Curated annotation (Swiss-Prot):
Residues 83-156 form the PUB domain. GO terms for biological process: programmed cell death; protein K63-linked deubiquitination; protein linear deubiquitination; regulation of inflammatory response; regulation of necroptotic process; regulation of tumor necrosis factor-mediated signaling pathway. This is Spermatogenesis-associated protein 2. It comes from Danio rerio. Residues 457-480 are annotated as: Disordered. InterPro entries: PUB-like_dom_sf, SPATA2_PUB-like. Keywords: Cytoplasm, Necrosis, Nucleus. A motif (PIM motif) lies at residues 320-337. Bridging factor that mediates the recruitment of cyld to the LUBAC complex, thereby regulating TNF-alpha-induced necroptosis. Required to activate the 'Met-1'- (linear) and 'Lys-63'-linked deubiquitinase activities of cyld. The keyword Cytoplasm applies. The gene is spata2. It is found in: Cytoplasm; Nucleus. It comes from the Eukaryota.
Amino acid sequence: MDAKLREDLFRRYVASLENRLEEGAAEGGGDRQGAKTEEALISTATALLGSYQADPGQRFRMLRFYDVVENSLRTQRGTSLRTVGTAFATLETICTNLLLFPWKKEYRCIKTFTGPYVYQLQSVLCDSDLRSLLRSMGYSREQELQYNVRDHPGGASHLRQLAFELLLAQAECRLLGEVVSMSRGFASELEAVELRRNTREDAAGCADALRRRDSLTGDLSRLSVRPLDIDRAHLRRSGRPSKSVDVTDSAGHWHQASKPVLKASLSLRKEPLFVDTEEDMKDEIIRPSPSLYPVAAPPSYSPVADFFPIQSPPSEPYSYHLSSLDEVDLYTERGLGGHQTPSRPPSREPRDSWVLKGHMMKCQGCGMGCPSLSSCQRCDMILCSSCHAVDPAPCCGFQDYTKTSRPLDGYMPIKEKLSVYSSAHSHTHPHPHPLPHAQSHSLLLDKAVMSSKLFPSKPVGSGPSPVGSLVSSGSSSSGGERLSVGGSRCGFCNKPGASHTCVNCSKVSCDTCMSLYASDLCTRKNPHHNFVPNHQLNFKSSTISHLVYR
C-alpha cells in the first residue's frame, strides 16, 4: 500500500469515528450508517492491500498480523481466515469503544466469561497473542475473570492507529480468502499466509505463485519416485510392438521387444516361465513383486537392439531360479494361458537320495548323522564316507561278524529272493554268508505256489510266504502267527523290509534303523519313538476281494 493512499484512508477512518461519536451522542441510532461506512472502508482497504507494494513490511506497523494468524491456524482447532477476521473485528470494536467512550465503566472492564470473549476471541486466537493485543490497548489482567483498563501513555492517537490497523487486519483476512479461492484448491490458508508475508505481488500474482509451487512440488515428488519406476520397467508390457519402431510405455521407459520376461507360475513349481513380450497380453494385470528385483536387472536401452533384435540362446536351460514359494504372486498372476512351460529334465538321482533330503540320516555302521550316505555294494548297509574308507568295512568286511542282510521279521533282499525263486534246487547264493535253513527252499516254494493257487483272491502279504518261512523257526503252524513279506519300505533308509512300526507316529522302520532312531523325537505328544513289531500290532484287516499287486 502506498504511503499517500494509506494516509488518506486513515483520515477517512478517523472521520467515520467522529461521525459515529456525534450520531451516538445525538440520537443513539447511527449504528446502521456507521456499519455501512465501515464496510465501505474495509472494501477500499482490501483493494489497496491487494495492489502491488514495494515493501510488504509496511502493511502493518503496530500489529504482528502474520504471526498472529499463523499461530492461530496452526494451534487452534477449527480456526479459519473467516473466524480470525471476526476476532479482529471484535478487537476493533473494543478499541473504538474505549477510544470514543472512555468514561463508561462497561468499556473499562472485559469479563472473560462472556460470550463474545469466549467464542470470538479465546477459541480463535492464542492466549499469548490475545494478551499482547489487549495489553496494547491498555488492558491488564489483574484478576482471573476480567481485564481492567489503565490509561495508556500513548493516549487517543495510539488507540486511533491501533484501531485502524485492526481494520486493515480484517481487510487482509478477506484478501487472503480471495487468494485461496483463486488458487483453485492448490493451496491451503496457511500456505497463502506464508506466501503473502514476503511477496510484493497482488492477489492474482499470489494465486499464480501458489499454483506454480504446487505443480513444482508434484513434479519433484514424481521425480523422487522415478527410480523405482525404472526398476520395474522391465516387467511392464505394451501391446504388440513392432520390430522397427522404438517401444515405450506411457511413462517413457524403453522395452526390448525380443527379450523374454521372467514371470512366476501359479503351478507352485520352482521352474521359471518365459513369456515372449510379442504375445498379446492386453488383459493381463502386472504388479511386480519386490522379490523379483534382484533376480533380473532392468535392461539398459540400446537403439541397435530395437532396430536389429538379436536373440541369443541362454547358456543354461534355467538361468533364473525362484528361491522359495513365497516369491510367487498368487493374486495378480495369470495361468499358463496357452504358453508351454519348458519340460523339466528327468531327474538322475536315485530314489534313496529323495529320502535323504527329508531328514538327517544316520550311518548304520557308526551311528553318526551324515548328509552324504551310500549303501554297501555287497550287503546294502547304509554307511558314511568314513566307514567306507575303513578297511575292512564295519558291515561285511570283518570275518567274525555274522552278517545277515535281512531283518528278523522275514525280509530277504531282492538278490536272495531272485535266487530262491529262480534256482530252488540249487542252493547257491550270491551272498558271502550262506542262508540258514536252505534245505527247505523247494518245499516252501511249492507251498507258496500251492497257496497262491488255492486262494487267488487273498492278498500276497496276508498268508505265510517262503520268505517268512525262511526267517521263522520252522515250528509255527499254518494259522499261528502273522508273518509279513518285506513289501513296505523303511521310513528312514527307504529299504524294503520295514518290520517295526511306531505306535505314536505310525512310522515304519527296519531293525537297523530302529536301534539308531529309537531315541529321536517322535514329533507327537510323546518325546521318543515307540517301535513295536508288526506282528504284535492290534489291528484287524478286512478281507480284500481282489488280488493286490505291489
